[in-house]
Amino acid sequence: MTRRVACTQSRLCGNFFVLIVLGVITLVYFSVMLHYTEHLEDRSSQLFLAVLHLSLFMLVWSFAQAMLTDPGEVPPFWGFHMGDSEQKRRRYCLMCHVFKPERCHHCSACNRCVLNMDHHCPWINNCVGFYNRKFFMLLLVYVLLTTYLVAAGMTFPVWNLLNDLYVHPVVTDYKPFLIVCGYALDVLLAGVISMFFRFHLHLVSTNTTTIETMDKAGHKPGEVVST
């Protein structure tokens, strides 16, 4: 489903978060390639880079799908034939002028009602809803896979690099700095996304959403939940 974009201040700010994501991916990838371009003749390095590039491709693909897929909108004239007038009053959105099905919420960032809304994610500059939640989960899977691969492939090179820097503390180029920074950022990202993925895996397995979980925790009804 083609995404319908509403131009709001939150939407414009979301573009900045998307650029941050792309910048992090580029930095981590560049730090890995700085090391492995010097070992391309090694079969194990070739295998590692092949698997890494496949995982990275799937990460970028799922990121694009989660960002560009419309999360879902209320079908035209839905709910006009509901018999309970009190229910119709409670489920009517005064901003979109539609009757909202269950789990449909109005997102102030997107300025629209979203089907089966889980939360608004600024990192993909989109709501996670009915049609793109699977892509969002795939994105988390491939982020974890890619960050774990980078951590596995760069731990010993970074360890050796730090030992060399301890013995010879004079740095003559930028490569050691970028490699260490990229590795540290990758490990941090792997830890954060691991907890985030565990939370969303629990939501999927229990057939619930972030908004419902936050409502149970005492958030105000209608409050936009974002990651």
Language-model features, listed with the residues they occupy:
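Membrane-associated feature with strongest affinity for ZDHHC
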Residues: M1-T227
